[in-house]
């Protein structure tokens, strides 16, 4: 996107940007949506400071799309974000909105932004947040999406905001669990976030030295897993750590009987 500055100091998108043409704006908004991710506050700070460089005013939208509908706007400036870079969570809060997916909710959101003089919105969040942004973009609001999700499941993004911290936190937990697993010669299963994405399990499992990693993207065979664990113990292995993404478990290929709760009975403990 080609960015230039008018004589008045306001930032605008030059005609070189393509089919959108020249867009003049002097105020933008920023919101965080979805689950909070470590680094969101640093991203908010970066947006505010960069906007200040281009002499743009910044409005913070509290509680994501819920706040967009209910006009929960606050003014942001470099001073208001001076001490947030190392804080977890998000200073703009985050909340679910049952109203935004409706045409009425989206129309109200656009109306509130236009009434506030906002032409551009920066959305810091994950895939669901970006889908919401696409709806606003189709209504004429310029959108920039900043990938911020611990699942790291945004296409064409190497590392989303929050993913690295999450992996390091899981590795730290695995390192602590391993000592107990070795002492008692037991199997420990570590479940991590990732309903449809196995990035956390894969990276943390590799970095933490887990014996087995199960991810939603790869079909797992529970019987084969058990055979590998038993084989390891016969060879003298003192413990086994299995890292499992939360989305794994619905399609196990197994001949074992499942009880009424659908819980897998790996063996007597």
Q: What would you call each of these model-derived segments?
A:
Residues 112, 123-125, 131, 135, ...:
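Accessory alpha-helical/coil subdomains and C-terminal extensions
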Residues 33-36, 56, 61-67, 96-97, ...:
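Short, ordered loop/turn segments at secondary-structure junctions
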């Amino acid at each position: 996107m080609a960015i230039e500055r008018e004589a008045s100091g306001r930032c605008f998108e030059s005609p070189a940007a393509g089919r959108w043409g020249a867009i003049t704006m002097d105020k933008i908004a920023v919101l965080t949506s979805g689950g909070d991710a470590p680094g969101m506050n640093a991203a908010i700070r970066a947006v505010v400071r960069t906007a200040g460089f281009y002499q743009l005013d910044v409005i913070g939208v509290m509680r994501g799309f819920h706040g967009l509908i209910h006009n929960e706007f606050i003014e942001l400036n470099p001073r208001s974000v001076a001490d947030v870079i190392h804080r977890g969570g998000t200073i703009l809060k985050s909340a679910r909105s049952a109203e935004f997916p409706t045409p009425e909710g989206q129309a109200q959101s656009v109306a509130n932004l236009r009434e506030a003089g906002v032409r551009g919105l920066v959305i810091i969040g994950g895939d669901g947040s970006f889908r919401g942004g696409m709806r606003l973009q189709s209504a004429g609001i310029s959108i920039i999406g900043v990938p911020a999700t611990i699942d790291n499941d945004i296409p064409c993004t190497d590392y989303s905001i929050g993913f690295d911290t999450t992996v390091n936190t899981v590795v730290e937990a695995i390192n602590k669990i391993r000592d107990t697993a070795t002492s008692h010669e037991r199997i420990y299963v570590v479940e991590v976030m990732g309903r449809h994405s196995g990035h956390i399990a894969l990276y943390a499992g590799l970095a933490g030295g887990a014996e087995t990693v199960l991810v939603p993207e790869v079909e797992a065979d529970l019987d084969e897993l058990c055979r590998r664990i038993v084989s390891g113990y016969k060879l003298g292995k003192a413990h086994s750590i299995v890292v499992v993404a939360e989305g794994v478990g619905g399609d196990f290929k197994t001949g074992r009987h499942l009880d009424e709760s659908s819980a897998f009975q790996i063996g007597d403990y």
